[in-house]
């Protein structure tokens, strides 16, 4: 999930106390083919939730019929065998401290497992990244550079890091509350006041990041997780694989083209230098989805999608928009503006009347029915177009995969047309 450009090496820890293993000698034993060729999937993965039904899509594939001459050991149940298999891929220093429980996420160069601290029995997530691959190395460097600096209630916390010659193991908080839109579907009621509570937590985390010179660059619903299943759970921001970290107060412009198409800001599409205002555009898209269950910009054709974004044209037609307050629409309008200089900052967004009125006059109309129907309708449509049963998940309507990442060639062609039109 890297941007395709090299990044600087991680900074030393500042705000977080880390137990960092600088170098671990290779295993003296013989490595099996499974160990050497561990990564086989085709997508990257960020910090992943656990304990939520949808996590089953990341489970280890069910074994097929046994091949000739091969049978499962009768003394070891399949689940125990799978856990043992993944445990064997971890450095002994990790398994000495953490008990490997289950695989909860996988990617082309990473795995995320649920673990338990042997001494305290506290659950954590460990993200294991194969740094021998360039893309994995870039994502690892980016995440470590950010997570070593941050300490905020609404941002995933790094606990400690173990490093070997070919892998990095990042021990992080375990978010068990599920994804944002999965919770909305399950809740049965969702009002503007609920929306402002969610956005206030996310905005406070983004404000903190921007104050440190950190731009997330890939804010989207699946990177916003509930910390626990309770109704009072906080939201945490995850997945900093595309993040840019600069020195505090440094206003230097960024140029790397990266992000997820539906959430990417216009200035990135035309390959102009950009600032952390790209995160605010993405938050405008998230706010729009949060209040309607639909996307402001959407088209299966990338070129048409990008043209929609460049024009900044979206609609408030259809349900539930007639029931949404003008104040909420004004909040979105001030974020989804093509001119990055005119967009609200995170601090300004926190002070917007719609967010400030969260506990007082925000609309209490229940938008749940329309939002749920829109999310499920879009998920069903996506399922038919991809012929994938997994697409029926409610939050699948806002998900992206590697094939949906921004492609340099498409942006070069789009930028050429844009320049020709502008100069003509």
Curated annotation (Swiss-Prot):
Record EC number: 2.7.11.1
Residues the record lists as Phosphoserine modifications: 380-381
Biased composition (Low complexity): 385-398
Posttranslational modification: Autophosphorylated on serine residues. Myristoylated. Required for membrane association. Prerequisite for palmitoylation to occur.
Superkingdom, natural source: Eukaryota
Pfam families the UniProt entry points to: Pkinase
Keywords carried by this UniProt record: ATP-binding, Cell membrane, Cytoplasm, Cytoskeleton, Disease variant, Endoplasmic reticulum, Golgi apparatus, Intrahepatic cholestasis, Kinase, Lipoprotein, Membrane, Myristate, Nucleotide-binding, Nucleus, Palmitate, Phosphoprotein, Serine/threonine-protein kinase, Transferase
Regulation: Activity depends on Ca(2+) concentration.
Record-annotated Protein kinase domain positions: 98-355
GO CC term (a single one): plasma membrane
CDD domains: STKc_PSKH1
Catalytic residues in the record: 218 (proton acceptor)
InterPro entries linked: Kinase-like_dom_sf, Prot_kinase_dom, Protein_kinase_ATP_BS, Ser/Thr_kinase_AS
PROSITE patterns according to UniProt: PROTEIN_KINASE_ATP, PROTEIN_KINASE_DOM, PROTEIN_KINASE_ST
Residues that hold ATP according to the record: 104-112, 127
Outcome when changing residue 183 to C: In PFIC13; uncertain significance; severely reduced protein serine/threonine kinase activity
Sequence segments annotated as region (Disordered): 56-80, 378-407
Listed GO MF terms: ATP binding; protein serine kinase activity; protein serine/threonine kinase activity
Record's catalysed reaction(s): L-seryl-[protein] + ATP = O-phospho-L-seryl-[protein] + ADP + H(+); L-threonyl-[protein] + ATP = O-phospho-L-threonyl-[protein] + ADP + H(+)
Family according to the record: Belongs to the protein kinase superfamily. CAMK Ser/Thr protein kinase family.
Function of the protein: Serine/threonine protein kinase that may be involved in the regulation of pre-mRNA processing. It may phosphorylate components of nuclear splice factor compartments (SFC), such as non-snRNP splicing factors containing a serine/arginine-rich domain (SR proteins). Reversible phosphorylation of SR proteins may cause their release into the nucleoplasm and change their local concentration, thereby influencing alternative splicing.
Disease: Cholestasis, progressive familial intrahepatic, 13: A form of progressive cholestasis, a disorder characterized by early onset of cholestasis that progresses to hepatic fibrosis, cirrhosis, and end-stage liver disease. PFIC13 is an autosomal recessive form characterized by progressive liver dysfunction and chronic renal failure often associated with unilateral renal agenesis and glomerulosclerosis.
Name of the featured protein: Serine/threonine-protein kinase H1
Gene name tied to this protein: PSKH1
């Amino acid at each position: 999930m890297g941007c395709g450009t090299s990044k600087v090496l991680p900074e030393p820890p500042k705000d977080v106390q880390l137990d960092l293993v600088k170098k671990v000698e290779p295993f003296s034993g013989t490595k099996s083919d499974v160990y050497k060729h561990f990564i086989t999937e085709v997508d990257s993965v960020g910090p992943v939730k656990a304990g939520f039904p949808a996590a089953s899509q990341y489970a280890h594939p069910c074994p097929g019929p046994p091949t000739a001459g091969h049978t499962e050991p009768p003394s070891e149940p399949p689940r125990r065998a799978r856990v043992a298999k993944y445990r064997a891929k971890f450095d002994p220093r990790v398994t000495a401290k953490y008990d490997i429980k289950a695989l909860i996420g996988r990617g082309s160069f990473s795995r995320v497992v649920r673990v338990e601290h042997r001494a305290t029995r506290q659950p954590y997530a460990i993200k294991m990244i194969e740094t021998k691959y360039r893309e994995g190395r870039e994502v690892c460097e980016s995440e470590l550079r950010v997570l070593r600096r941050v300490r905020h209630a609404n941002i995933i916390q790094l606990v400690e890091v173990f490093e070997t010659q070919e892998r990095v193991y990042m021990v992080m908080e375990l978010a068990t509350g599920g994804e944002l839109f999965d919770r909305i579907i399950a809740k049965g009621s969702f009002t503007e006041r609920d929306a402002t509570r969610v956005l206030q937590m996310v905005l406070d985390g983004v404000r903190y990041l921007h104050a440190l010179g950190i731009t997330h660059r890939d804010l989207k619903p699946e990177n916003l997780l509930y910390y626990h299943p309770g109704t009072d759970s906080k939201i945490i921001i995850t997945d900093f694989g595309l993040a840019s970290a600069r020195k505090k107060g440094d206003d230097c412009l960024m140029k790397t083209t990266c992000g997820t198409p539906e959430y990417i800001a216009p200035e990135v599409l035309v390959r102009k230098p950009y600032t952390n205002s790209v995160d605010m555009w993405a938050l405008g898209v998230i706010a729009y989805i949060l209040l309607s269950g639909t996307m402001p910009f959407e088209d299966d054709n990338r070129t048409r999608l990008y043209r929609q974004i460049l024009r900044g044209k979206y609609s408030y037609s259809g349900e539930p928009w007639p029931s949404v307050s003008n104040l909420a629409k004004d909040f979105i309008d001030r974020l989804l503006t093509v001119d990055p200089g005119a967009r609200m900052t995170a601090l300004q967004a926190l002070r917007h009347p719609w967010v400030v009125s969260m506990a007082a006059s925000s609309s209490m109309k229940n938008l749940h029915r329309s939002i749920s129907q829109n999310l499920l309708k879009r998920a069903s449509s996506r399922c038919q177009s991809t012929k994938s049963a997994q697409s029926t998940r409610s939050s699948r309507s806002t998900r992206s995969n590697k094939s949906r990442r921004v492609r340099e060639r498409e942006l070069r062609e789009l930028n050429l047309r844009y320049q020709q039109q502008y100069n003509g």
